């Protein structure tokens, strides 16, 4: 039985995220147990962001030329290698090596499957509304994220009999499980994803399908030119920079923050890790609710996706500030979940706005440009917020992050005003589609 486009995308991406986040609830704690401080963690995670940023556009252009499926599988295998390096890392140099390999992996995989999914949907129905499709896909991915973090949080407790020092410790078990899971996902992608040869899609490859370096860099140049010419893309990418920064501040700092709220738990020996898994798993679980709220709110507001995005950004900023000021485990957990709910709600309307501005032939490279913006922000967030947390407190870093994300609602208000001026009240496209969506005019 052949799976549909939606079924294939939902299955592969949800399993991918399940395997990827198995160690996420304890990964920072594992690095700390091997003598790495918060500032050093910010440094190697910042390097990861730099590597992704440098490779994003070339790798996205390469994926458009060589095929999204092939790029995704190669990136998945590099991801496995990166996790092996982390498993064996005991000093900053090794963690920096991990960051380089992981960055190369992320650059290859980012946007590859999403581009395949969007193009396949639009081939079936060019007028399809992408927001509910992306929200549904996001919900399936969040199920994988939630289950993966819960399982990863439970594994150290189940293997608490292992020594607290060495390669295979309780905190390292989720990483080992993740390596196996990612290998399975790469194999599934190879079997389930069906893609036309890039030459058939682009009509630009030579008879043997060989890639020419000049073509790749020409594709990159077109993407850069598109961003320079489009004020709407620049505003959307600016928000991606901010989200990248605050997400880095959240992911790098939440484990030590919540570990201090678990008095008496020997985390290095596996104590309290299930609670951390519940914290992170629950955050992804409420993200499903965020997708539902985004879809309902978009409908209620006439598919004004820019306005919906602005509302979620302000709410997310407030959640970060209150989280920073909280001091009790249950209250902090609820507020942490709220940051994920609002960020999940923001994602699909933001992505819908972005995809309106992009044409099929450059979709992967433009998604790479979007990812580049996010990781450029992540570099700043990792280094700056990590250093600020070590010099002051994690709470101070999160207050700064909250103020920044709330301020990022302004670009959406500008976009919403442009949309309302550009479309007559009775124009059916005023409910959310780009004014030039039907013809492709004005898209990049």
Model-inferred region functions:
Residues 100-142:
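Cytoplasmic helix-loop-helix junction between adjacent transmembrane helices
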Residues 1-54, 87, 92, 232-280:
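Helix-loop boundary and gating motifs at the non-cytosolic
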Residues 1, 14, 42-46, 53, ...:
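C-terminal transmembrane bundle of multi-pass solute transporters/carriers
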Residues 14, 82, 93-109, 330-345:
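Hydrophobic core of transmembrane alpha-helices in multi-pass small-molecule transporters
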Residues 134-156, 373-381:
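Glycine-rich segments within core transmembrane alpha-helices of 12-TM secondary carriers
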Residues 171, 178-207, 413-427:
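Helix-loop junctions on the cytosolic side of multi-pass membrane transporters
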Residues 1-3, 193-238, 430, 435-443:
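Juxtamembrane intracellular "pre-TM" segments in multi-pass secondary transporters
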Residues 77-91, 95, 314-327:
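C-terminal ends and interior cores of transmembrane alpha-helices
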